[in-house]
Every structure is written in C-alpha cells, then in structure tokens.
Amino acid sequence: MQSAHYTGRFAPSPSGPLHAGSLVAAMASYLDARAHQGRWLLRMEDVDEARTVQGAAQDIAASLSQLGMHWDGPVLVQSRRQQHYQRACAQLGERVYACGCTRKEIADSRLGMAADGAAIYPGTCRSGLAAGKRAHALRVRVPEPGQALEQIDFEDRWQGWQRQHLASAVGDFVLRRADGFWAYQLAVVVDDAEQGVTHIVRGADLLGSTARQIYLQSLLGYPTPTYLHLPLVTHADGEKLSKQNGAQALNLNRSLTLLHEAARFLGLEVARVDGVAAFWELAVLAWRRRYL
C-alpha cells in the first residue's frame, strides 16, 4: 500500500546514458520512496535542450526498468512544459527584471563564484538596462542583507543544518537564460510543486542550489519538500563522475553486480541474491533500517 504523504522523484538530464553516479542517485531516491511506501516519479530534465542527446531519455527509462526500478505514473518531460514556467515567472511580477550583462562583464565584477560555479551577480541591471544594452536574460531579485528571506535555513537529512545568504552567495539569479531556455532553478521548483513532490533525494552537487529553490517556493506559495543530498561518486582525482567528463555507460549485463556496488556506496549491506526483484526487497529493508 502506497503512502499518500510521500512523493519522491528521479530527475536525470537526458544528455547521455545512465552511469555509476546517476545509478546511485536513482537507487537512493527509489529506496527512500519505497521504504516510505510512497510514490516514485520519473522526470526528464531536458529544459536545457542544447545538451539533450537524442534517444537518451528512452535509454535511461529502459535502463531503469531493466534494473528493476519502476516508476509511478507518466514520465514528465520539461521541454513540453514551457507555458508552466512562463506562468510562474509572470507570477513573480516586479521581482523579475531584464538583464543585459554578458558573462564576461559579470565575471569582471570579481564578486566570486556561487556554489554551482556561476559568477555572483553584482546587480548591474537591477534599476534598468543601461543605455545601449539589450536584454539577454531574466533575473529574480533576492532580498538585501537583513531582509526577510535573504537568509535561507534548512535541515538536510544527510548533510545536516544548512544556511545560505542569497545576496552574498549568489546575487539575483537567472530565471530565463540568454539563449531563451528556462533556467533549471525555476523549472525544477515548478515541476516539484505541480507533481506534489514531498521528498527530494539527489546528489550533493545540487546542495548549493537548494536555498534558491526554497526562495522561489516561498515567493510562489509552494510547499518546501524535505531534502537529502547524497555524497557524489567521483573519479580517482576527486572530480564528480558525469557524462561530461567521460563516465562510462552501465553494462546492464551485470545488473545485479551494479546494484550491489551502488548499495555498498550508500552504506547498505544487501545479501547476495539470485534476481533483481529479490535484491530490491532486501535493499528497501536495509535502507529503512539505516536511514529512517
């Protein structure tokens, strides 16, 4: 019997096939949902259409199925939801403004880098575009230091207590990019709210984005989910394993071995079994014992 109080999701970017790092994230989100007797959704985060690889979404879904991870309901695809993001942006009203700054101009302000690697925005276009400047992107204002919602606090189930000052850590951030694509921060907030997501389990590379997402949730009147940010699977040099730096596609002929390796990374002891279904039964129990 599924719980009406838990909805989780796995939301990969279809820029390539599943690899060891994305398997860990998928497994953890799946186990947390099933251990809570909740729903587990699948979303394809292809809002950045320039990075989308043709056929990757279908490959990811097929791989999850072969590995025994079966989602509830239809797959949500971000690239089909442009009007939803437009409506949310319009709802923010005067908090949104056009920005004509180039990446170089922002970097030249030397305010440092946000946790996601983007340069901290100095607020150049807050009071309007300078003469001769053309709008490139849309940004949302963050509060000045000391104002309500400038400091975002939340408890992460894995990483513990978190605090971020939006003004100094990121500045006014992008909602629609210069290339016309909606930014991840807005799209993920809208999708989580409209899908009723209550619990988010994902990699720690997104921990630094969470305060911005909580801020947007507050502005839009959305509930804030519970967060768990996992340690990242890395190369030997410590760099995050990703499609962009050569992570190898999973060999699904080794499905059980792959599942056991991912479980060990998550600190789970799962006895050797003969089939995928039996693995998941034991893995759900192991997750429940350790993390609930």
UniProtKB/Swiss-Prot annotation:
Residue numbers covered by motif 'HIGH' region: 12-22
InterPro entries attached to this UniProt entry: Glu-Q_tRNA(Asp)_Synthase, Glu/Gln-tRNA-synth, Glu/Gln-tRNA-synth_Ib_cat-dom, GluQ/Sye, Rossmann-like_a/b/a_fold
Gene Ontology MF terms in the entry: ATP binding; glutamate-tRNA ligase activity; zinc ion binding
Positions of short motif 'KMSKS' region: 240-244
One GO term of the biological process aspect: glutamyl-tRNA aminoacylation
Pfam family, one: tRNA-synt_1c
Keyword Aminoacyl-tRNA synthetase applies: yes
Residues annotated to bind Zn(2+): 99, 101, 121, 125
Requisite cofactors: Zn(2+)
Root EC class: ligase
One GO CC term on file: cytosol
Family to which the UniProt record says this protein belongs: Belongs to the class-I aminoacyl-tRNA synthetase family. GluQ subfamily.
Protein name: Glutamyl-Q tRNA(Asp) synthetase
